[in-house]
Design a protein with these regions (language model features):
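Extracellular/luminal low-complexity segments enriched in Ser/Thr/Pro
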Residues: 411-424
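Solvent-exposed, low-complexity, repeat-rich "mucin-like" stalks and linkers
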Residues: 350-394
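Short, solvent-exposed loop/linker segments at beta-strand-coil boundaries, enriched for Pro/Gly
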Residues: 396-410, 485-486
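An edge-strand/N-cap motif at the start of beta-rich repeat modules
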Residues: 1-8, 15-18, 28-33, 311, ...
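Conserved core positions of repeat-based scaffolds
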Residues: 39-42, 51, 109-112, 121-122, ...
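Short, exposed coil/turn segments at beta-strand boundaries within extracellular/luminal domains
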Residues: 434-443
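A short beta-strand micro-motif common to beta-rich folds, especially ectodomain repeats
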Residues: 423-435
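Short glycine/serine- and acidic-residue-enriched loop/turn motifs that recur at repeat junctions
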Residues: 1-15, 53-81, 122-161, 173-176, ...
Length: 501
């Protein structure tokens, strides 16, 4: 049950704890979390997976596409408002899925990696994003018309099934031959309507919608089975160490820290000094220069993909952004779109001094010429707001909830979103320059409100469409943001005037 009070709309600007109970009625030991468009996943230390939120395409993997709640809520939207265990089919019988080591949620679909390197997917399958190939059959209700308005009679899968890859000589996808089940996978990421996986030999495969080149196999066609990503010369892309799938684009960090991207580039989000979409892995450059090797972005450790914005973290801790920059959402206080990676400048250049961060508060100097954008903070950053005004003068104290510290960036809608996991005692907020009206990022340390000498650690955080899921170092899961589809997992979606269910 939640341990904090929610806002009266049913959404919350402060973190609420999600109750995830195991078979023995003890709290499950959660080690990883993931967030899709309107659903969430949580992985336990024993390899099981829990899910909650929107379930109209079976993206929760529980064997149904209906509405369930501890309060027996019945309505038009299929959802689970509290966590449920993801199921598996074993000899035709439903059992709890097990031995999972990696999870990802994207759009209305989910993907899991088992310890033996096999991949299981479920949810919406209309563009091949589940990677079933010719093995997709109509059973367990994946075309069951729970409501024509909900599934539009499109294929979906309510129980995890194993994904397949196509033969390597079938890169054109014409009359493709299914080869084998996908194997030796170490990492998987589900995008909006496509998925990308990393094999233990450094090769990258993808499946699903490919009309913008987001599959990276050299063509702009969709596929219902995994195909191998190639580089700009048509050779198999190799030496990848991590991968990421976005809205209509994909990315991979190669050994040595080089960043490669492919897919939609209409907003310059590929960072290759152009606005032309790419169907093969293309290296990201710095600024507008591609004349020398030193002009390529290097030493990248983490990459995060939004709709039209890309953010990368360097080994030295610097943050690099590129893509659309409406109102300065790339964090550099200008209104210029970058076709190559641009480093977010030092915050003290703009006279913002956060040296006196303590006790969970940040004090902004009274002579600062900035205002805090509270619209962004209200739904994502979890601030303890003083009133409902859109903007507040920068001077004075601002409180952080103790569950919120992280490094984040701003997406195309001006919303704060995280860029990587494992961040310790850091939070990023947006501020608005009163002289130009452009927004930028400010990073500050955050300490425990009850112990001003102790920083707070959150090892993992994930953002959905307009909500956030955080895993604290003690294994507890906290959520905040929009809760219209039960994606916060707290047992209800609406509150009465007293803030109670």
């Amino acid at each position: 049950m939640p341990t904090v009070q929610l806002g009266r709309t049913g959404s919350t600007s402060v973190a609420a704890e999600v109750s995830i109970v195991g078979d023995t009625d003890d709290s499950a030991n959660i080690i990883a979390i993931a967030a899709g468009k309107e659903h969430s996943l949580a992985l336990t230390s024993d390899g099981r997976v829990y899910a909650w939120g929107l379930n109209n395409y079976g993206q929760l993997g529980h064997g149904t596409s209906g509405t369930h709640s501890v309060y027996n809520y019945t309505g038009d939207v299929a959802r689970y408002e509290t966590p449920v265990i993801i199921m598996d089919l074993n000899n035709g019988k439903e059992t709890q899925i097990h031995s999972i080591v990696s999870i990802s949620a994207g759009g209305d679909s989910s993907i899991l990696v088992r310890g033996d390197g096999t991949v299981f997917t479920f949810g919406k399958a209309d563009n091949g994003q589940l990677g079933y190939g010719e093995n997709l059959t109509v059973n367990d209700g994946e075309k069951d018309n729970i409501s024509d308005s909900k599934v539009n009679s499109t294929y979906h899968k309510t129980i995890p099934s194993q994904a397949v890859n196509r033969s390597d000589d079938d890169t054109t996808l014409a009359g493709g031959i299914i080869n084998t089940y996908l194997q030796n996978v170490t990492e998987a990421d589900m995008g909006s309507e496509h998925a990308v996986v990393l094999i233990n030999n450094g090769f990258v495969y993808s499946t699903g919608l490919g009309t913008s080149g987001q599959l990276g196999n050299g063509v702009s066609d969709s596929t219902d089975g995994y195909v191998r990503v190639v580089d700009s010369e048509g050779n198999y892309f190799e030496n990848a160490v991590n991968i990421s799938a976005g809205y209509n684009q994909s990315a991979s960090v190669a050994k040595g820290g080089a960043l490669y991207m492919w897919g939609d580039n209409s907003s310059k989000q590929l960072g290759d000094d152009s606005a032309t979409s790419k169907s093969s892995a293309t290296r990201v450059v710095k600024g507008h220069n591609i004349h020398e090797t030193s002009d390529y972005l290097s030493n990248v450790t983490t990459v995060s993909l939004g709709n039209t914005v890309t953010t990368a973290i360097n080994t030295d801790g610097t943050v690099w952004t590129f893509g659309t920059n409406v109102s300065g959402v790339l964090g550099d206080f200008v209104n210029y779109d970058y076709t190559g990676a641009h480093m977010v400048g030092p915050v003290d250049y703009y006279a913002l001094n956060f040296d006196n961060v303590e006790g969970g508060h940040i004090r902004i100097p009274e002579d600062s010429t900035f205002t805090l954008d509270e619209i962004n903070l209200k739904y994502v950053a979890g601030f303890n707001l003083h009133d409902d005004s859109d903007f507040r003068d920068a001077s004075g104290d601002y409180s952080f909830e103790s569950s919120d510290p992280r490094i984040a960036t701003v997406d195309s809608n001006g919303t704060i979103t995280p860029i990587g996991n494992g961040n310790y005692g850091k939070v990023t907020i947006t501020v608005t320059d009163n002289n130009t009206g452009y927004r930028g990022l400010v990073v500050a340390d955050v300490y425990n409100v009850s112990d001003r000498y102790t920083k707070i650690a959150i090892p993992m955080i994930a953002s959905g469409l307009d909500f956030t899921v955080a895993l604290k170092s003690d294994g507890s899961v906290w959520t905040w943001g929009n809760n219209s589809s039960g994606q916060l997992g707290i047992g209800y979606t609406t509150l009465d005037a007293d803030g109670k269910d």
